């Protein structure tokens, strides 16, 4: 095998693979990429047995073939090549040779036949979707995905087609919940919702971030999801299980509703939480007519408070929250103001854009 390719093009392919390959894999070959050269160009594949990606790139191929070498090592080398072009050649005993200008590398490889086969996506029914819309939905839910591996059902986002072309995405870690509903026209042919794993979702976000406006397709088979855009395809295994009945934890309507500038609340929470307890990030919200006071107390550091003007008429209330959870929600909203609904000190808080129920965030209270 031998081909010549633009270094930036090869770097792009290898960068896509970095989040998928296993750095400390029990199977060493899962730390590799499979580079295949044919008459139509070069493909670079990465697969960790759960998520696989294949990207296609133009190249001058003088001899077809395949190699598999360390993804990280190859990426690091290509990132610092002295010339705009690089020649890749397969040597005996699965070694790979890279040449760019006066720079020359000889890398240890493995037999390409040992690289695991990626699942075929023939059974997946792919639907053309809006890249910007899908990217927005991921950004507005990913922060609430659980990192607790013992609660594997919550280690992903729930993708649920609704009526009239609407799709709902929901994530929760048991302490907070994020829900967003948008129009993604097309029939995904799903009998019920599916759970997209956290790692797969983050890789999907990275691919969408490359070119949000590019045409893309999303589809599902029995236990896998497929994402495609020009020159690239990604397949991932879905989480097998039943997502919790999330509707039950969303309060119908809070007794106390206030309107506050999003940026003011965001900045105040960041300032005051500097003196909150390290692990809990606890802050206290005290609500009275047209006033919201935010306080934090740390026996080792001291205390802090800040007052914000809000649109509110009603009784007083004091309730505690994890400041980090509130900050995460405010950070994904674009509106100038945010609506906050509260019940009592034991009830969850609900945050939404004013007059818009297509996004809902629920944050559980805490003792402070």
Where are these regions (language model features)?
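Structural preference for solvent-exposed beta-strand-turn elements
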Residues: 1-368
């Amino acid at each position: 095998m031998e081909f010549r390719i633009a270094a930036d093009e090869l770097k792009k392919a290898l960068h896509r693979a970095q989040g998928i390959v296993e750095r400390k894999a029990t199977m060493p070959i899962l730390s590799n990429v499979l580079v295949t050269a044919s008459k139509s160009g070069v493909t670079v594949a990465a697969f960790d047995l759960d998520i696989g990606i294949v990207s296609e790139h133009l190249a001058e191929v003088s001899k077809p073939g395949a190699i598999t070498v360390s993804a990280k090592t190859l990426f690091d080398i290509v990132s610092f090549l002295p010339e705009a072009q690089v020649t890749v050649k397969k040597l005996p005993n699965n070694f790979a040779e890279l040449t760019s200008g006066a720079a020359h590398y000889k890398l240890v490889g493995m037999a390409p036949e040992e690289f695991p086969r990626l699942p075929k996506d023939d059974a997946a029914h792919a639907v053309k979707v809006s890249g910007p819309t899908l990217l927005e939905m991921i950004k507005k839910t990913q922060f609430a995905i659980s990192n607790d591996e013992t609660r594997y059902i919550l280690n992903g986002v729930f993708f649920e087609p609704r009526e009239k072309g609407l799709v709902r995405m929901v994530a929760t870690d048991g302490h907070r919940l994020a829900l967003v509903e948008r129009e993604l026209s097309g029939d995904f042919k799903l009998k019920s919702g599916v759970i997209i794993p956290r790692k797969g979702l983050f890789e999907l976000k990275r691919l969408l971030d490359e070119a949000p406006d590019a045409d893309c397709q999303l589809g599902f088979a029995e236990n896998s999801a497929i994402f495609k855009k020009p020159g690239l395809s990604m397949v991932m295994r879905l989480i097998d299980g039943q997502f919790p009945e999330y509707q039950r934890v969303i309060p119908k309507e809070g007794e106390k509703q206030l309107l506050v500038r999003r940026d003011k609340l965001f900045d105040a929470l960041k300032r005051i939480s500097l003196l909150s307890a390290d692990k809990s990030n606890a802050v206290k919200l005290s609500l009275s007519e047209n006033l919201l006071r935010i306080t934090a107390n740390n026996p080792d550091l001291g205390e802090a408070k800040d007052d914000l003007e809000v649109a509110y008429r009603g009784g007083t209330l004091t309730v505690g929250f994890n400041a980090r959870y509130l900050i995460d929600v405010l950070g994904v909203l674009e509106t100038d103001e945010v609506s906050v609904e509260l019940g009592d000190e034991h009830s969850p808080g609900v945050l939404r854009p004013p007059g818009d129920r297509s996004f809902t965030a629920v944050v559980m209270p805490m003792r402070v």
